[in-house]
Amino acid sequence: MDGMKKVPVREQEPKVRATNFEEVCYGYNEEDAVAEASRCLNCKNARCVQGCPVKIDIPAFVKEVKEGNYAEAAKVIGKSSALPAVCGRVCPQESQCEGQCVRGIKGEAVSIGKLERFVADWSRENGVVPEKPEKTNGIKVAVIGSGPSGLTCAGDLAKLGYEVTIFEALHEPGGVLTYGIPEFRLPKQGVVQPEIENVKKLGVDIETNVIIGKSVTVDELMDEEGYKAV
């Protein structure tokens, strides 16, 4: 294998994809994921981490993939990201983590996003779920909106022990993940819903059909329902 080039990712053939709305990209299988992870140089001062908005320890999780320790890779990613299956598919890696990859200077960057997706999909298929914090601090926090930023915020707060409730105006949670990105790019039942369920497993409650300012006000949340922050 040419170490300067990415391992090709499997996709639907154009003639096939033109007949359905299923996900176009199949992602890596285990063999391809290990091969791609083996291209990582494990840089001491990893530029890819600086390019990641949530600062995932990319060399650490890629190393675990290389060694076949997918559950451990999931734990590394889970420390920083609540939505790895989503981010592995729709984040603009080419201008973020992969855009900073040293491999990309004289060749092709490591396919960090595809590896993140592989780990997330493997975790879902093998029943690996995020660990709920053993204790909460008793402090209630409300998050307005269940789009990617709201879900991420809620997940991070839950990991720190806060009692978090997300209030969503629409019928289904997910925001742009549910209502904006097409199925062939981001499957709803197979990817988005399981990711939302994983956030719930951290202890986050989600209330839909709640319009802040109409159904309930911020003052009511804080003065009457005991929320300490919104």
Predicted regions span which residues?
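Ferredoxin-type iron-sulfur electron-transfer modules and their immediate structural context
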Residues: 1-140, 227
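Beta1-alpha1 glycine-rich phosphate/pyrophosphate-binding loop at the start
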Residues: 2-26, 55-67, 75-78, 105-113, ...
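Short hydrophobic core segments
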Residues: 33, 144, 167, 227-230
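Conserved beta-strand-loop-beta-strand element in the redox core of flavoprotein oxidoreductases
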Residues: 211-230
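A generic local structural motif
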Residues: 127-131, 192, 216-219
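Short secondary-structure boundary/hinge segments and terminal tails
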Residues: 82, 119, 175, 216-217
